[in-house]
Curated annotation (Swiss-Prot):
TM region(s), chain numbering: none
Protein name: 2,3-bisphosphoglycerate-independent phosphoglycerate mutase
Cofactor comment: Binds 2 manganese ions per subunit.
Keywords associated with the record: Glycolysis, Isomerase, Manganese, Metal-binding
Length: 514
């Protein structure tokens, strides 16, 4: 009979940041006796989850992808956002062979260059400065037909903030004398990640057929009409932008399409609709043979050109566990499953030897304020069973509630989400203690602790750049170290497990055994 393992458990409370002011703070306004007691009685510290400490530009808010890559890597990983900023600043972006070839191919054949992406200064999935650089690259290389298909944000940015961005691009096209905004649509449609293909189809038809529910002469006019219909940026319905006498911007065989999002999870579905010959998410009314370029690799099985292929990370936490013959479990709901697997493993899709995965379906609701507890009860049940099973050396779990409900901007719902989590943490803590295991509770970035923007008074639906908690529960007598960051978590776990830390991990343990 094999000896029961005492697991090292990492619970990531997504979007659960630390802020001392109670005003508009869903976490401090919720009843959280369990987390309050843990914070009061257990070793704890605050860690950085944003900006330079996670490889993002200074003061840039953290996000789930970046957070999990840093958590699993045990070193600061410079993100695509920072990498692209540097490339554009140093002008190497304008010589990227994949991008220049794609533009030249269309130009030489008299075809159009279509550029699509999330038009946002949020910096989570994309950055409008990168899209602007792509517009400049296309114009500089002599492309005549340049069409921008703008996905609108309102989630990583204030709910109604797209007008300034659209105006900037309309001014740019006017100044350079070629190109235009061809369509606008909310990210709710274009950037789904939960197989809601009816949404994706609307965005796909808008771009391929130049057909939408609405039409406007200019992008700004189209946006203002959406606001008049009470649609915030995220939910703007498919709108064709075409003034009297302007050519149709429908996509044709031989056109180039460059997708300027750098984050993978919400880029995959629409990319597959364009690229996969055997795509079956919906019946495509028009299949276009495009020269399709992904800015970064959205998935290894999407067979199309990549402008910036991934840099590989050696000896992430998951790989190091496998090399040391340890068993590990990754568990979350649909919304954050990719984060505890693909992102935590440094962009590796395949599970490592000894790595098991459990996926709990997120509830099928339009927005999560309608079900703030999400699937946390089922997730907790499965997590507790895994802790008690004695099968795993380590377990990584993500609870999405703080982030997914925080994104809705609905304070009452976010409070309910936090209260549901407190009950879950109670069960998890008891299970870990009953088997003599160890538990770290932390977050990947903030969100629910700031539900209203103090400057604008609008709902605050974006992440924050505030620190996140880190709490230790276990039998070891440990002392917390100040000044930590997300990339210190993997070394902390290895140290608590009594394991060697690989040299590639430059993070430091945040709990020292006394």
């Amino acid at each position: 009979m094999s000896v029961s393992k005492k697991p090292m458990v990492l619970v990531i409370l997504d979007g659960y940041g630390y802020r001392e002011e109670q005003q508009d703070n869903a976490i401090l306004n919720a009843k959280t006796p369990v987390m309050d007691a843990l914070w009061a009685k257990r070793p704890h510290t605050l860690i950085d989850a944003s900006g330079l400490e996670v490889g993002l530009p200074d003061r840039q808010m953290g996000n789930s992808e970046v957070g999990h890559v840093n958590l699993g890597a045990g070193r600061i990983v410079y993100q695509d956002l920072t990498r692209l900023d540097v490339e554009i600043k140093e002008r190497t972006f304008f010589a990227n062979p994949v991008l220049t070839n794609a533009v030249d191919q269309a130009k030489n054949a008299g075809k159009a260059v279509h550029i699509m992406g999330l038009l946002s200064a949020g910096g989570v999935h994309s950055h409008e400065d990168h899209i602007m650089a792509m517009v400049e690259l296309a114009a500089e290389r002599g492309a005549e037909k340049i069409y921008l298909h703008a996905f609108l944000d309102g989630r990583d940015t204030p709910p109604r903030s797209a007008e300034a961005s659209l105006k900037k691009f309309e001014d740019k096209f006017a100044a350079q004398g070629k190109g235009r905004v061809a369509s606008i649509v909310g990210r709710y449609y274009a950037m789904d990640r939960d197989n809601r293909w009816d949404r994706v189809e609307k965005a796909y038809d808008l771009m391929t057929l130049a057909q939408g529910e609405f039409q406007a002469d200019t992008a700004v006019a189209g946006l203002q009409a959406a606001y008049a219909r009470d649609e915030n940026d995220e939910f703007v319905k498919a709108t064709v932008i075409r003034a009297e006498g302007q050519a149709d911007a429908a996509m044709e065989d031989g056109d180039t399409l460059i997708f300027m999002n750098f984050r993978a999870d919400r880029a995959r579905e629409i990319t597959r609709a364009f690229v996969n010959a055997d795509f079956d998410g919906f019946a495509r009314k028009k299949v276009v043979n495009l020269n399709f370029v992904m800015l970064t690799e959205y998935a290894a099985d999407i067979k199309t050109t990549v402008a910036y292929p991934p840099a590989s990370l050696a000896n992430t936490f998951g790989e190091w566990m496998a090399k040391n013959d340890k068993t590990q479990l990754r568990i979350s709901e649909t919304e954050k499953y990719a984060h505890v697997t693909f992102f935590f493993n440094g962009g590796v899709e395949e599970p490592f030897a000894g790595e098991e995965r459990i996926l709990i379906n997120s509830p099928k609701v339009a927005t999560y304020d309608l079900q703030p507890e999400m699937s946390s009860a089922e997730l907790t049940e499965k997590l507790v069973a895994a802790i008690e099973s004695g099968k795993y050396d380590t377990i990584i779990c993500n609870y999405p509630n703080g982030d997914m409900v925080g994104h809705t901007g609905v304070m009452e719902a976010a409070i309910k989400a936090v209260e549901a989590l407190d009950n879950c943490i109670d069960q998890v803590t008891k299970a870990v203690e009953s088997v003599g295991g160890q538990l770290l509770i932390t977050a990947d970035h903030g969100n629910a602790e700031q539900m209203r923007d103090p400057a604008t008074g609008q709902a605050h639906t974006a992440h924050t750049n505030l620190p996140v908690p880190l709490i230790y529960v276990g039998e070891k007598n440990v002392k917390a170290v100040e000044g930590g960051k997300l990339s210190d978590i993997a070394p902390t776990m290895l140290s608590l497990m009594g394991m060697e830390i690989p040299q590639e991990m430059t993070g430091k343990p945040l709990f020292i055994v006394e």
